[in-house]
């Protein structure tokens, strides 16, 4: 693959096959960018062809017998919140939010609580600071944190990459004791709002996996586009 207008090649490797963490009985295999450092423009080009970031690693599924992972993005300037999403915004009017690139112990403490109480049966359990930093941080692209507060108490965090023409949602976590607030929904809506204010074209949400119920929420932000063999296409599948 060529990395820029000068046709400088970049190396792409392929991982071993290992059990899929999203679909029982399936096997996973990844294409992995082998470069130690990328620039935001190149990374955004890779997002547009289906790659994702985890830590400093850039990868794309290339599974032997499965194509369930569908890259999904929201065209921000066309996005309109649904009635339910508008109710979520109204219900959380009492909360405040701020944008920072600072990493704090309070953020990690909330992440640890979230994983212990909401994902104790998943691959991210048990949480650790080393795992947290390896998963979210990238030495060539510092992430942006959208923090949500109830008075002075941190209740939710969205971790996102800010790129020239888009946002890329990396991960969101929140206080499990505040489940009635639908903070996961709120965090995506805040990313949409911020992206629109900054004139971005897209919010990349990662991979939509229809067969995994926990991943189905990504289709709720409309309109959205799915990356197919023909390119990015609008979809109305619920």
Curated annotation (Swiss-Prot):
Top EC class of this enzyme: transferase
GO biological process: proteasomal protein catabolic process; ubiquitin-dependent protein catabolic process via the N-end rule pathway
GO cellular component: cytoplasm
GO molecular function, one term: leucyl-tRNA--protein transferase activity
Keyword annotations of the record: Acyltransferase, Cytoplasm, Transferase
Transmembrane segments: none
InterPro entries linked: Acyl_CoA_acyltransferase, Asp_Glu_LeuTrfase, N-end_Aminoacyl_Trfase, N-end_Aminoacyl_Trfase_C, N-end_Aminoacyl_Trfase_N
EC annotation from Swiss-Prot or TrEMBL: 2.3.2.29
Keyword Transferase found: yes
Localization per record: Cytoplasm
Catalytic reaction(s) noted: N-terminal L-glutamyl-[protein] + L-leucyl-tRNA(Leu) = N-terminal L-leucyl-L-glutamyl-[protein] + tRNA(Leu) + H(+); N-terminal L-aspartyl-[protein] + L-leucyl-tRNA(Leu) = N-terminal L-leucyl-L-aspartyl-[protein] + tRNA(Leu) + H(+)
Superkingdom, taxonomy of origin: Bacteria
HAMAP family named in the record: Bpt
Listed PANTHER family: ARGININE-TRNA-PROTEIN TRANSFERASE 1 (PTHR21367), ARGINYL-TRNA--PROTEIN TRANSFERASE 1 (PTHR21367:SF1)
Function of the molecule: Functions in the N-end rule pathway of protein degradation where it conjugates Leu from its aminoacyl-tRNA to the N-termini of proteins containing an N-terminal aspartate or glutamate.
Similarity remark: Belongs to the R-transferase family. Bpt subfamily.
Identification of the protein by name: Aspartate/glutamate leucyltransferase
Organism: Shewanella oneidensis (strain ATCC 700550 / JCM 31522 / CIP 106686 / LMG 19005 / NCIMB 14063 / MR-1)
């Amino acid at each position: 693959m060529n990395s820029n207008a000068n046709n400088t090649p970049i190396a792409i490797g392929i991982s071993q096959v290992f059990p899929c963490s999203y679909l029982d009985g399936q096997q996973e295999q990844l294409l992995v960018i082998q470069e130690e450092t990328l620039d935001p423009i190149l990374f955004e080009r890779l997002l547009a062809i289906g790659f994702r970031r985890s830590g400093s690693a850039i990868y794309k599924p290339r599974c032997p017998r499965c194509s369930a992972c569908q890259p999904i993005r929201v065209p921000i300037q066309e996005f309109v919140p649904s009635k339910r999403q508008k109710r979520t915004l109204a219900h959380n009017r009492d909360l405040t939010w701020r944008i920072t690139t600072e990493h704090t112990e309070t953020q990690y403490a909330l992440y640890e609580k979230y994983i212990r109480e909401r994902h104790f049966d998943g691959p991210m359990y048990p949480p650790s600071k080393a795992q947290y930093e390896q998963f979210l941080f990238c030495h060539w692209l510092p992430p942006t944190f959208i923090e949500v507060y109830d008075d002075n108490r941190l209740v939710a965090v969205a971790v996102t990459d800010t790129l020239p023409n888009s946002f890329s949602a990396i991960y969101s976590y929140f206080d499990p004791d505040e489940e009635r607030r639908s903070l996961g929904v709120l965090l995506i809506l805040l990313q949409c709002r911020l992206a629109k204010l900054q004139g971005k074209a897209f919010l990349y949400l990662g991979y939509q996996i229809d067969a995994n119920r926990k991943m189905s929420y990504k289709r709720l932000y409309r309109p959205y586009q799915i990356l197919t063999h023909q390119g990015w296409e609008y979809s109305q599948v619920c």
